[in-house]
Amino acid sequence: ILCKAYRKMYPEEAGSDRTEYVYWSRLAATKLGAEYFKYDYFRRFLHHKVNQGYTLKQVFKGMELSDMLAGCIVAINSESDEEDSGNGDRVRKMTAGKTSVTENEKLTSTIAEKIEKYLKKNWMEVLNHYRDQRKAAGEYYGRVLQGHKKVAAADVGWAGSGAVVLQYLIRHEWGLDCEIIGLLAGTNSIHNGMEKDTAEGLRAVGKQASYLYSQEHNRDVWKFHNAAKGHNLLWELLLSSEEGSLRGFYLKRMESGAGGNGIFCEIRLGVFDEKHAGVTVEIQRGILDFMQLWNALTPGDRAEAVEISGRDVYAAVRICCDEANRQEMEKLFDKEGI
């Protein structure tokens, strides 16, 4: 919808050499950037899912590491405690009465730490699961960025990691000479605890820009916005795609009867939900209707109103942050794919 609205507002930018809708998501970024952004990998795939009702089977499926689950369970169940023997040596003692962990065990903080320990011990095997996905994404973005030295990647937010991971892959994994500038709707807020400053350094050096608010811009909005109250999800719903969230990039061999035996990139999206897609279309039809009214303004009127501040935009959506409205809108989300 951002691409559609931008092209309506600036028809001269409508060509594919100027703007293009591209596939990317925090799920894809987390997998593809795991080698360098290990902390983010475990935070998103493990620690954010603690005590949320996810089973170990679901967690490993989400990471696309299902074949490593059995080995991890064996490692967890065979884990033992260490005791001091009294003469300075350490001896291993099996924990008495310990209940065996199964694939249907719910993820807790204790189990998450043990899974992280196991995956770190087998880190190269983890990365090898995403090797072909990194190659496939490189094929895709190699075509998208061909002939470009500097591009802006527009994203909702919030830590700005999407553009950061993409920049790392472009330079260090795929060897492309292109600079990425992240354009965010909003950054992490004061309610993000230790991660509230994530985007600030990048903004300071001009690698990211935030429209709605930041620590130095509309600070009252920065203090109001709270992911724990669903505020992130409201914005993501407004700007989400009707075709489903990106699951990842995959290499696929072309059939011999389809023009050759080459390898090409297959883009996989989340499960298409007609109900959610219909709601998204309705919401975004309103956005496009507004753009049509905007473009109908006379040049003089348009010049007066050309700057719509981030505060004004947030004020309209803030109504949806009311508890009753928020609960109704949350029923529409594909939280797993966002």
Spans of features found by a protein language model:
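Short, surface-exposed basic-aromatic patches at helix termini and helix-loop junctions that form
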Residues: 3-17, 167-176
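Conserved beta-strand -> loop -> alpha-helix junction used to position metal-binding or nucleic-acid-contacting
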Residues: 12-32
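Long, contiguous domain-sized segments
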Residues: 20, 30-63, 67-338
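Intrinsically disordered, low-complexity regions enriched in small/polar residues
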Residues: 8, 12, 23-25, 38-44
